[in-house]
A protein has these predicted regions:
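Nucleotide/pyrophosphate-binding catalytic subdomain
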Residues: 1-137
Length: 137
């Protein structure tokens, strides 16, 4: 006899901005929220911004270092704050027994044009994200 789920598993994309992940306590609070959502039977793709005013700090640092701001390098700099936040979020989720993997935009399958600082999405191939979700990550 096969069992049929009464409620299909939902795939939720949840986005949390810089204030929501602005310090370790807030990161843990978001992780708790995600854990509850997963325990309700949902799959979650979590998107986080850089912590608090991290992006502003990075932009000020760029100004302090250089009077020129090549677009590609500014994009690389800005993603440093986002990478920090997503790595810390994955660590908090691991502490709650939820294995999680972080992905940059390109690792997640987003293909953009080369208009740095204002790129447009050309295509999305979320294969790596699907594999991680199917593995319970």
């Amino acid at each position: 006899m096969s069992q049929v789920a009464l409620y299909p598993v939902a795939l939720l994309v949840q986005k949390f901005g810089g204030t929501a992940v602005g310090d370790p306590d807030r990161i843990r609070a978001v992780a708790d929220h995600v854990a509850r959502t997963v325990k309700q039977g949902n799959k979650v793709v979590l998107v986080v911004s850089a912590m608090g005013k991290e992006t502003d700090s990075l932009l000020r640092l760029a100004d302090d270092v250089s009077s020129t701001h090549p677009g590609r390098e500014m994009d690389m700099l800005i993603t440093a704050g986002e990478r920090k936040a997503m790595a810390l979020m994955c660590m908090a989720l691991h502490d709650l027994g939820l294995p999680a993997d972080s992905f940059t935009g390109s690792q997640a399958g987003f293909l953009t044009d080369t208009e740095h600082r204002n790129a447009r999405i050309l295509n999305v191939r979320p294969d790596r994200v699907r594999v991680a979700l199917d593995a319970g990550r």
